[in-house]
């Protein structure tokens, strides 16, 4: 299958996806917010006042959900890509495995973290068969 046909199929699938459409209505940056919402409904993770770190945060829908549900808590969103701010959260652009980024996290978290979350995907472009 040609790449152009694959791209068209992906676009058509996105247009039909109920979660993609609902994310636009609800103001989430991506459909993945509903995955976290489902997890939270089952396990009751997010409460007011929590300190939350979102690793691999871009485009930010998990951070949006955490900020909305953890309300008065602290949110740090970390990603290699620059991200638009979410409320009064802290955005750190960097690799969380690097010491410089870890120091920035420590500087902003005040020693205590209640939730560490990540929805990162493996970069398959680096895998060669």
Where are these regions (language model features)?
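S-adenosyl-L-methionine
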Residues: 81-112
